[in-house]
From Swiss-Prot:
Entry superkingdom: Eukaryota
Post-translational modifications reported in the UniProt record: Contains 2 disulfide bonds.
Primary localisation category: secreted
Protein name, entry field: Augerpeptide hhe53
Length: 38
């Protein structure tokens, strides 16, 4: 997977990108978006 801005892709999933919003990381994963709190 790809890693940007301290982001890492989930194991077993393909993330096409990620963006850091305030205190959370938004993962652009197919087929849906997954949001993780940091």
């Amino acid at each position: 997977g790809l890693s940007q801005s301290g982001c890492q892709a989930f194991t077993g999933r393909w993330c096409v990108g990620c963006e850091r919003l305030r205190s959370r990381v938004v993962w652009e994963c197919s087929p849906k978006r997954v949001v993780n709190s940091i």
